[in-house]
């Protein structure tokens, strides 16, 4: 990798990651967000994640968030903490991607669709549009039987 730094001046402290696109290799800078998620404290986790994304967005081509970064593994409050596809959090992620021109892989979120909550990963393009969505096949419904 040291040789690669010499070939790509201006990369600064964030080392490039090589991605094969089908048209050849492309160097990308990844902003991998690692954070202490406070279980059940959705607002604090979201605020902290956006602070961290703000710090790396000017250097990164793509930002990657961790699994269940909004609520951790707080399955007791899934009903009140689930995200809906059109809600403010989705809009904020979309706006950040578009504003910074950065791809965002939004880790996974508990997303509620049609009365079912699933662990869902979202990919936002540089234009802010959702480019990919994947929900794990197992829902959280069985964990919410006591609600």
PLM regions and their residue ranges:
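A short acidic/small-residue loop/turn micro-motif
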Residues: 136-140
């Amino acid at each position: 990798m040291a040789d690669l730094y010499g070939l790509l001046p201006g990369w600064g402290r964030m080392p490039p990651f090589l991605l094969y696109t089908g048209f050849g290799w492309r160097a990308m800078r990844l902003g991998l967000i690692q954070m202490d998620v406070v279980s059940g404290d959705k607002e604090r986790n979201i605020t902290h994640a956006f602070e961290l994304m703000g710090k790396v967005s000017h250097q990164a081509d793509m930002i990657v968030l961790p699994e269940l970064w909004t609520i951790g593994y707080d399955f007791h409050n899934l009903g009140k903490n689930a995200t809906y596809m059109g809600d403010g959090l989705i809009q904020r992620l979309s706006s950040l991607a578009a504003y910074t021109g950065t791809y965002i892989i939004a880790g996974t979120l508990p997303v509620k669709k049609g009365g079912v909550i699933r662990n869902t990963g979202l990919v936002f393009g540089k234009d802010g549009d959702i480019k990919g969505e994947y929900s794990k096949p197992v829902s959280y419904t069985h964990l919410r039987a006591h609600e």
